[in-house]
């Protein structure tokens, strides 16, 4: 009786004595090694998780008015979009924020096009002449999650959070030069503002009004293009005016004339530079594992945190290492003495650890299969099975990278 081979048996018989079989096996293994080297190591999976925040300003309105006139009508419009999973809204005085979450797997570009189309083709939901401003859409995705966060903190009581914020903004410009970085921003801290407190008696004493001061401030804090000068076949653009940038600029601002003498703003007002009221409070403190990380235990210290996100499809490990190395180089220049930098998030390291652990587990599983086959059937069969498993894994890794 003649035995008929099935599909797998016929395929094996075809390649058993074929001269291309060793070449294909070696090629598959080399492609697998190539895929392991070039595949980006990322903490967050490269899947389409699209959501967006829609900001609608309604100046002067209360939270209840924002909810009734902005949030509820917008929720109805956004809920009709195909592929939307959830719509959330937050109403506060003068502003409504709506969050649109799409289903996992919805293509990002198509989802955002549908969102913009729904918002700007349904502008008639806004009541006329009530002061509701056009919506602002800020889309977010999986690549907006920071891969590195560096916390700047200090125990120096002479430094305030606005000092840390200035240092952080200076570091942002340097970090953005690292290839592969996408979004760099700072969390926490207080901006430095100039507070002007007018003295009504001094204003009246110089024969001025509040409207005179307002016009002087508005006219002085402007920059305009004033033409160009041509010299030696070179055109030099000319700008008139400067922006007010510090307390001294504001204090020495001429706001009028009195008895043929200029009146400066600090003649009629008390001008103080100080930190603005913070939107968030950020502190740095250590836990039980501080000594293991090489950090001296501290209770609480003011801090700001620089968050760094990466571009899609790039290697988180390489970018994180480059960012940390760049911060180390800046410690002697932009980071003054007494300000400490602690890496509080490093998804590059965790992604590399997980990838290495996966390869170790695959290697352990392959060796276990080879040893089990060796003990049960013999060394020849173990070599055949081990080679087949390794080649299959290598081809799978390459296919995963390619598609």
Feature map (PLM): residue ranges:
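Membrane-proximal extracytoplasmic
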Residues: 1-366, 374
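Hydrophobic transmembrane alpha-helices and their membrane-interface caps
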Residues: 34-38, 367-403
């Amino acid at each position: 009786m003649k035995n008929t081979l099935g599909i797998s048996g016929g395929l094996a018989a075809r390649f058993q004595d074929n001269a291309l079989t060793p070449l294909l096996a070696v090629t598959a293994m080399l492609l697998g090694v190539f895929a392991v080297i070039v595949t980006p190591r990322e903490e967050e999976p490269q899947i389409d998780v699209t959501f967006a925040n829609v900001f609608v300003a309604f100046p002067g309105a209360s939270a209840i008015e924002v909810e009734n006139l902005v949030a509820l009508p917008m929720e109805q419009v956004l809920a009709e979009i195909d592929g939307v999973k959830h719509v959330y809204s937050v109403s506060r005085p003068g502003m409504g924020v709506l969050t649109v979450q799409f289903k996992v797997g919805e293509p990002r570009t198509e989802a955002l096009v549908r969102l913009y189309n729904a918002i700007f083709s349904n502008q008639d939901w806004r009541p006329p002449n009530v002061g509701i401003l056009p919506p602002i859409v800020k889309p977010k995705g999986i690549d907006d999650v920071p891969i590195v966060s560096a916390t700047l903190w200090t125990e120096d009581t002479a430094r305030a959070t606005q000092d840390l914020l200035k240092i952080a903004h200076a570091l942002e410009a340097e970090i953005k030069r690292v290839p592969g970085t996408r979004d760099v921003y700072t969390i926490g801290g207080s901006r430095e503002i100039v507070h002007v407190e007018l003295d009504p008696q001094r204003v009246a004493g110089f024969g001025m009004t509040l409207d005179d001061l307002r016009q002087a401030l508005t006219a002085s804090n402007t920059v305009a293009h004033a033409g160009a000068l041509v010299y030696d076949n070179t055109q030099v653009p000319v700008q008139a005016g400067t922006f007010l940038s510090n307390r001294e600029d504001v204090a020495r601002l001429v706001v009028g004339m009195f008895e043929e003498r200029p009146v400066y703003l600090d003649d009629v007002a008390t001008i103080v530079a100080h930190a603005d009221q913070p939107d968030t409070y950020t502190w740095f403190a250590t836990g039980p594992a501080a000594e293991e990380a090489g950090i001296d235990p501290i209770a609480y210290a003011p801090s700001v945190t620089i968050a760094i996100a990466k571009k899609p499809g790039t290697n988180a490990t390489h970018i994180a290492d480059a960012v940390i190395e760049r911060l180390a180089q800046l410690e002697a220049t932009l980071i003054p003495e007494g300000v400490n930098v602690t890496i509080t998030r490093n998804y590059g390291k965790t992604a590399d650890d997980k990838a290495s652990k996966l390869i170790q587990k695959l290697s352990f599983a392959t060796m276990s299969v080879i040893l089990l086959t060796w003990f049960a059937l013999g060394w020849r069969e173990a070599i055949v099975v081990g080679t087949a498993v390794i080649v299959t894994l290598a081809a799978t890794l390459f296919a995963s990278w390619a598609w």
